[in-house]
Structure formats: C-alpha cells, structure tokens
C-alpha cells in the first residue's frame, strides 16, 4: 500500500486529505510535473496492512494451534519465560476480562529504530522500519523471522524525530478497528469462525526512540521518564554534560548504610531524600492530554520545556482507548542498554583513542564532585 506524504513530513495524504494539492501546514506541493506532463507524487511511504497478516496466522496449520500457547501452557508462580508471565500482561487481563477470556485474541509489540541503508561513507540517510510481533506464540516462535511483521518503512533521508506519529496513522486506524469493531477470522485448527480482537501491549526501542514514541523527550536534565521534574541530575562544570551521578541513593531504604556515606559518592554529601513519586497511569494521561498531537498542529516548544517538563507532544498511541490502562507502555531493548554500557566501560578501561570517557574535562570534573 503506497501512501503519499508531505515533503517535509508534516502530514500524510490519507483519508480525508488524499486529494489535497498541497500540505495543510507548510503548503508544499503534493505533486510535481514530470517531463511528460503527468503529475507525480513528491514523496511516498510503503505501508503493509496488519489485519490480513493476523488473519493468516489462523489460516495456517503451522501457526494456528500455537496461537493459544500462552493460555494453555501455564508456568508455576515465580517462573518467567514469556511476556504472559509478566505483571503487565496479567494486569491487562484483570482490566479487560472479556478480552482475556478468548485466548485467540492477539497481543502485539511494536519495535522501531533508525538505520543507514547505504554504506557508512555515503551521504547520511536515516530510514525507520516499524515491526510488529504477536506474543501469543511460544518463545521459540515468537521472535523468528516469519512472525516479525514489517508494518511500514518511514523513508529518509532525515530522522522523523517527534513527527514519527504522522506515519503511524494507518497503523492506529487498524489497531482501533481490531479493538472496537473486531475482525471475523477463520481458525483452521478448530474449524470455526471467531471475532478477532487485538491489542498493542507496548513499544520496544532504544532510549532516543523512546522519546520519539512516548512524547517525553530524552534530552536534557529531565530525560528520565520516571523521575520527570523530580530528578536530581545536574550539569558537569567542565564537561557541560548532564550527569546522573549519585542520583540513585534516594531509592535505597532509609536506614541503608550507603545513605550516610559522605565521601564514597558525591563529596561531603549524605542522602536523606525519599524516592520520587511514581505517577499513576491516570496522572500521566492527565498531563499528556493537554498537549496537541503533531497530526493536528505543527510542533513547537511548550512553556516550561526543559525546566518543568520534557513533553513535546501528545503521543498518537493515546488514541488507543486502552493505552492509558497499560501498566507498561514503553520498553528499552537490552541490546542498546547493554552494548552502550559495555562500550563505554571497555573503551575507558582500555583507553581506546577517541572513544574513552577519561578525557581532560572528566579529569577536571572529578575533584569537583568526588573526594
């Protein structure tokens, strides 16, 4: 499925706007004239519909019997080998028992990240594929190539940043259809029709994409999406980088010995602070709903950005009526977390040229904050 979009990534020429001659935000032309005189679209993205592929999972004997695995193969308490063992899955079951009553209803995870499709020496080009995975399947099938569905490719050459929501509109429409209207599907393993219900459980990304998807930008002192404005981060005097050193003692029990150590963490500092409040799902939605969507307004910096909050938009995922009821909406993938940590540690210990964190400015900052 080919969908035209604005040259600047402001909007899709989709649904009510399919016949517009120019972008409703920046007024860039929808079409250009080819040498033959024919009108040609300026930019287009490719979208692969989700619903037909979900229905095909039940049309094949290779996958249909396994789509009930999460329900039929229960693990003992305390054993976790599948997302269905997690509290977020169980919380959703308790919140929507009618959905949980039909084990064939599908739960999905969304993953996206940017990559450069050309050689490193070529001109910079950022391309963003979006993948969806059904979690009904057993672990040995869940993350294999046949069941990781490419949903769309957000073309480059520029990073979409917070405008990534523009390209998610067809997906959100399908997810709403799967939740509100449901889709009649034939289950070949049980030889019967049923109304398929599907839910997007969470997103998985690196920290930068987390900010693009959630609407809480991951830059500056307020980068942490849990501490929010209650963070204890500070800016290094010489390195001028945001630092979260010694921000974690506040999470320890009040009588923990680390809290009273004056010189083992920040110099001459004890920590008597309580952990930051954990906002409920309702409180997060109460904050997010006051910000506009990038599909409705051009983005701009809101009052207090970087000081009182880091909101850049209302994420398009809030259009899913169940999104506010999720216990866990966004996840960090372990590959980026582990690799980045290891790279920094290894390069510093081994003093890798141009990659070590042990530089002159770091040496100047050490006596400022450490004994």
Language-model segment annotations:
Residues 1-371:
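Domain-level cores of phosphate- or acyl-group-handling catalytic modules
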């Amino acid at each position: 499925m080919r969908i035209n979009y604005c040259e600047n990534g402001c909007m899709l020429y989709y649904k009510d706007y399919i016949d517009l001659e120019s972008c409703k935000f920046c007024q860039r032309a929808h079409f250009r004239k080819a040498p033959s005189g024919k009108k040609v679209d300026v930019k287009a993205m490719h979208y692969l519909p989700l619903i037909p592929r979900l229905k095909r999972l039940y049309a094949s004997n290779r996958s249909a019997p396994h789509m009930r695995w999460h329900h039929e193969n229960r693990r003992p308490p305390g054993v976790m080998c599948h997302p269905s063992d997690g509290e977020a899955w169980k919380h959703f079951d308790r919140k929507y028992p009618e959905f949980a009553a039909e084990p064939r209803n599908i739960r999905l995870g969304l993953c996206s990240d940017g990559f450069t499709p050309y050689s490193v020496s070529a001109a910079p080009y950022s391309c963003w594929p979006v993948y969806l995975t059904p979690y009904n399947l057993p672990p040995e099938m869940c993350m294999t190539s046949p069941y990781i569905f490419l949903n769309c490719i957000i073309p480059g050459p520029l990073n979409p940043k917070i405008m990534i929501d523009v390209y998610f509109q067809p997906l959100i429409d399908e997810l709403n259809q799967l939740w509100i209207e449901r889709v009649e599907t034939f289950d070949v393993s049980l030889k019967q029709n049923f109304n398929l219900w599907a839910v997007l459980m969470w997103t998985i990304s690196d920290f930068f994409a987390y900010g693009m998807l959630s609407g809480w930008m991951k830059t500056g002192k307020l980068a942490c999406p849990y501490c929010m404005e209650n963070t204890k981060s500070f800016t290094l005097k010489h390195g001028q980088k945001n630092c979260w050193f010694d921000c974690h003692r506040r999470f320890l029990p009040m009588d923990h010995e680390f809290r009273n150590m004056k010189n083992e963490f920040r110099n001459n500092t004890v920590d008597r602070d309580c952990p930051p409040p954990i906002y409920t799902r309702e409180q997060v939605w109460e904050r997010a709903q006051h910000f506009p969507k990038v599909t409705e307004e051009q983005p701009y910096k809101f009052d207090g950005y970087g000081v009182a909050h880091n909101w850049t938009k209302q994420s398009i995922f809030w259009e899913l009526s169940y999104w506010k009821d999720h216990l866990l909406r966004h996840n960090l993938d372990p590959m980026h977390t582990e690799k980045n940590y290891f790279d920094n540690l290894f390069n510093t210990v081994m003093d890798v040229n141009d990659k070590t964190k042990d530089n002159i400015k770091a040496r100047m900052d050490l006596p400022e904050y450490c004994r």
